[in-house]
């Protein structure tokens, strides 16, 4: 008799939870949705989030507001979403591939990128182009040959220790087997100017900053870092095509929510975001920012970013990059 009573309670609870789950997707959102961007306003990641927010709001029937929570290399905003908000679908994170770099470069964070977030979707790939002065190098092979002939005489620009340009350069350096010195700068414009002035040998730059100078003949495009050629530079080979296996490094932008966000809410957010990303007007704006269309389901994106966390962790160790304290 007691077993029947317990079984009845279990069935009732299961039904209740199922009802709550179904209701959550139907009622969500009933108030404004906030997209947290952990980098500064005006960056490609920030502008991408704002483009999506503008088109997502009508589909959800609620305002979608972008909030910049910057600091500590993006970890302030990530920590806020991971630990300080309710996992109810009303706070969303949009961030770049820095999301998967930080577990290796900031090991003492109060959150875990791999365990505290659920993926929604990949927003787009953002290839980096390896630029150099045409007075010094016109091909990647020329640069590698020069670097091997005189070890540690070649240098490269980054926009911060452990940032994407740093890891991209190190992945190529390890794959091609040469030595080079890193020189950090405050941002991409400064790094590009140093390459133009021939004080720096190469820099993996966002395509948006480099393409006009490449078209004017002021910079050489030696290769792109991504697995596929960039839409804006279809004539430029990838580093792998240039002859260096396992040298590709993909930079991208994605969307996450706190881990315990109801699955049906995640699925609804993905479905509506997918509609936005499929809009020609949105694709045109994102491509202009250097972000090429890419799509992944939540399950695919979860698998993808977990693999990227491991790849970057292994790369940081292989390159001898010391984590931040």
What are these model-derived regions, one by one?
Residues 24-115, 152-153, 177-206, 213, ...:
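N-terminal (or domain-start) structured segment
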Residues 112-122, 157, 179-183, 201-202, ...:
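Short beta-strand->loop
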Residues 30-32, 175-176, 241, 263-325:
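An extracytoplasmic/periplasmic, membrane-proximal ligand-sensing/linker region
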Residues 83-90, 104-190, 239-241, 252-285:
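Hinge/capping helix and adjacent helix->loop/strand transition within the periplasmic-binding protein
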Residues 96-97, 134, 207-208, 226-227, ...:
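Short secondary-structure boundary segments
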Residues 1-3:
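N-terminal secretory signal peptides that target proteins for export/translocation
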Residues 7-19:
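Bacterial N-terminal signal peptides
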């Amino acid at each position: 008799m007691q077993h029947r009573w317990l079984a009845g309670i279990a069935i009732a609870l299961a039904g209740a939870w199922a009802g709550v789950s179904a209701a959550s997707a139907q009622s969500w959102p009933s108030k404004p949705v906030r997209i947290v961007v952990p980098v500064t306003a005006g960056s490609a990641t920030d502008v991408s989030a704002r483009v999506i927010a503008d088109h997502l709001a009508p589909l959800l029937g609620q305002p979608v507001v972008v909030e910049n929570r910057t600091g500590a290399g993006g970890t302030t905003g990530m920590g806020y979403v991971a630990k300080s908000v309710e996992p109810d679908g009303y706070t969303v994170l949009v961030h770049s591939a820095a999301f998967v770099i930080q577990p290796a470069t900031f090991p003492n964070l109060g959150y875990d990128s791999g365990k505290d977030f659920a993926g929604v979707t990949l927003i787009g790939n953002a290839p980096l182009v390896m630029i150099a002065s045409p007075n010094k190098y016109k091909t990647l092979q020329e640069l590698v040959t020069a670097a091997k002939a005189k070890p540690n005489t070649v240098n490269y620009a980054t926009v911060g220790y452990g940032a994407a340009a740093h890891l991209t350069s190190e992945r190529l350096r390890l794959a091609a087997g040469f030595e080079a010195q890193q020189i950090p700068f405050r941002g991409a414009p400064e790094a590009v100017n140093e390459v133009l002035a021939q004080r720096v040998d190469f820099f993996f730059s966002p395509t948006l900053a480099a393409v006009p100078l490449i078209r004017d003949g002021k910079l050489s495009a030696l290769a792109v870092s991504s697995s596929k050629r960039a839409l804006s530079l279809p004539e430029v080979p990838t580093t792998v095509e240039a002859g260096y296996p396992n040298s590709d490094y993909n930079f991208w932008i994605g969307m996450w929510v706190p881990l315990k966000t109801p699955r049906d809410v995640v699925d609804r957010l993905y479905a509506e975001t997918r509609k936005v990303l499929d809009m020609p007007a949105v694709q045109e704006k994102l491509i202009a920012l250097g972000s090429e269309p890419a799509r992944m389901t939540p399950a695919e994106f979860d698998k993808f970013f977990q693999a990227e966390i491991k790849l970057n962790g292994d790369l940081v160790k292989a390159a001898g990059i010391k984590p931040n304290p």
